[in-house]
């Protein structure tokens, strides 16, 4: 999926759209996506001047958005709005900086009615940057 196709699925827009491309997608099961981190990201103006680091919470948000795409591509959730229901077991292992390509790998674990859980992993050049268990709510 291209950025234009992603915007047809996710309600997020700049500066909060954190997924640039989808490489692999099995609707309702898993997704492999990317976020190209550039120096032009607004958050780098204050985090941190002279030493830019992507805020960890935005890495988790990117993972959640990727997971939301996997859910919203299911026929029963098309056109709905995804909400972040919770996060658990978050671990940050590597700083993400301008020029990095953040690879987002999300596997949906459970789905009951409009609530889903997933395991998520963000990597840069194959190195773990962040892992988390996510909870989604679709309305």
From Swiss-Prot:
GO molecular function, one term: (3R)-hydroxyacyl-[acyl-carrier-protein] dehydratase activity
Stated role: Involved in unsaturated fatty acids biosynthesis. Catalyzes the dehydration of short chain beta-hydroxyacyl-ACPs and long chain saturated and unsaturated beta-hydroxyacyl-ACPs.
Stated family: Belongs to the thioester dehydratase family. FabZ subfamily.
A Pfam family annotated for this UniProt entry: FabA
Active site positions, chain numbering: 47
Chief location category: cytoplasm
Compartment annotation: Cytoplasm
EC number: 4.2.1.59
Keyword Lipid metabolism in record: yes
Protein name: 3-hydroxyacyl-[acyl-carrier-protein] dehydratase FabZ
Signal peptide: none
Keyword tags: Cytoplasm, Lipid A biosynthesis, Lipid biosynthesis, Lipid metabolism, Lyase
InterPro entries: FabA_FabZ, FabZ, HotDog_dom_sf
Reactions it catalyzes: a (3R)-hydroxyacyl-[ACP] = a (2E)-enoyl-[ACP] + H2O
NCBIfam families referenced in this protein's UniProt entry, alphabetically: fabZ, PRK00006.1
Cellular component, GO annotation: cytoplasm; membrane
GO biological process, one term: lipid A biosynthetic process
Origin: domain of life: Bacteria
